[in-house]
């Protein structure tokens, strides 16, 4: 467990890991962390715009449309039913807080929840109250089916180490020795990138005692 007095900046590290994950496809996307959705103090963790309507191959981006709202929970936080409705409300506010009517089409919105613990209680509530169903699309990636807005759930520790290496390593429970050593070696090849630096800083501090 990390005992560093200074709070680890998980959200900037997640934003960096997210951009890294998309690799060459990131150039088609606009990433806007902590996007303010109105003049009031409400903000989306990350807003990803696909203005060019590129069909993404990356597994976490296949669900994406033009405007993609992402809610991220750090390793210490759980995703609950109130988080679901808050983020859903943010998506609706983002669609409506525009200068002209229907500037952002509802069918161009998606919602992604990224967390570390499978939210059983939240999903059970959605299944009971909203008749949602959960469909696994890939390792750690689930679609919540039953709403007009496409919704996906990403469980960081369950992501593929092959296809989502950097996001999968954004954790505070890397195994001492092998996983940490491999992370350092992989990072050393990209250490001049500010994105990789932000990610590595959080990961190394979170796993410092190991």
Model-derived regions: residue spans:
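Elongated, amphipathic alpha-helical interaction scaffolds
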Residues: 1-210
């Amino acid at each position: 467990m990390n005992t560093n007095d200074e709070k680890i900046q998980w959200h900037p590290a997640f934003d960096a890991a997210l951009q890294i994950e998309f690799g060459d496809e990131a150039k088609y996307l606009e990433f806007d962390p902590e996007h303010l959705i109105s003049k009031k103090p409400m903000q989306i963790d990350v807003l990803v715009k696909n203005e060019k309507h590129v069909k993404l191959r990356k597994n976490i981006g296949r669900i994406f449309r033009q405007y993609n709202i992402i809610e991220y929970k750090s390793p210490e936080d759980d995703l609950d039913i109130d988080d679901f409705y808050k983020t859903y409300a943010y998506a609706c506010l983002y669609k409506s807080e525009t200068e002209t009517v229907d500037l952002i089409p509802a069918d161009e919105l998606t919602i992604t929840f990224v967390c570390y613990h499978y939210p059983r209680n939240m999903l059970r509530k959605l299944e009971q109250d909203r008749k949602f169903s959960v469909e696994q699309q890939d390792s750690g990636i689930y679609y919540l089916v039953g709403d007009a807005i496409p919704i996906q759930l990403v469980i960081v520790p369950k992501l593929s180490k092959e296809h989502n290496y950097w996001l999968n390593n954004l954790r505070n429970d890397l195994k001492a020795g092998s996983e940490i050593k491999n992370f350092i070696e992989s990072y050393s090849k990209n250490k001049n990138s500010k994105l990789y630096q932000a990610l590595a800083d959080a990961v190394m501090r979170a796993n410092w005692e190991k």
